[in-house]
Amino acid sequence: MKLPQAFYARDTRTVARALLGKVLVHLDGGVRRAARIVETEAYHGPDDRASHARAGPTPRAAIMFGPPGRAYVYLIYGTSHCMNVVTGPEGFPSAVLIRAAEPIEGCLHSTRGPGNLCRALAIRREHDNGRDLGGDDLFVEDAPPPAEAVVTGPRVNVGYAGAWAARPWRFALRGSPWVSRPAPGAAAARAARAPAAPAPRPRRPRGSGP
């Protein structure tokens, strides 16, 4: 079942977490391409310095100011498309970036990372930007809540955003091999599980014998 518009018409951070485990589907020329979402990032409101909406409703970001449940697809580095879903109430610019997914069906490429994911599902700005996710070509299917724990951390590559870069608005399924970067908190978790290093053996004074 497709997610209804009401699913997206909530706080961006709530939607970013709730999308984990759901299935992104693109019907491309009659071919079904699908992947299970394992990593997202929330971009919340006009004050978020990491968001495209910080500059107002520019031609690129205008979709973020529109109704929830639309696809916001843009190009980075001139070659890679990124797929977002518009969230929250209309007029409050916010969206969730789908960073990575687990391939299920018809994927053409690795689905690890937002550019790879769009290539794998053949999602393109010129065809899919602004699409209503309640339609028949590009949508998100409901799925049971994931069994994996959800971990959070700072968003990727937004160092320019000052204090906003530290907001823990990246969400990922712990242990998924399809996450684009090590899952937030993974290094700390590994360190916590690692056995403590043995204490250094004290040196004996020279000539003290065995």
UniProtKB/Swiss-Prot annotation:
Q: Which InterPro entries match?
A: Formyl_transferase-like_C_sf, MPG, MPG_sf
Q: Which UniProt keywords apply?
A: DNA damage, DNA repair, Hydrolase
Q: For this protein, what is the EC number? A: 3.2.2.-
Which stretches are tagged as biased composition: Basic residues? 201-210
The GO biological-process annotations, alphabetized, read as:
base-excision repair
- Report residue spans for region: Disordered: 181-210
Q: Where is the composition biased (Low complexity)?
A: 181-196
Q: Name one Pfam family in it.
A: Pur_DNA_glyco
Q: Which GO terms describe its molecular function?
A: alkylbase DNA N-glycosylase activity; DNA binding
Q: Look up the domain of life of the source.
A: Bacteria
- What HAMAP family does this protein's entry cite? 3MGH (MF_00527)
Q: Which family does it belong to?
A: Belongs to the DNA glycosylase MPG family.
Q: What is this protein called?
A: Putative 3-methyladenine DNA glycosylase
Q: What is the lineage of its organism?
A: Bacteria, Pseudomonadati, Myxococcota, Myxococcia, Myxococcales
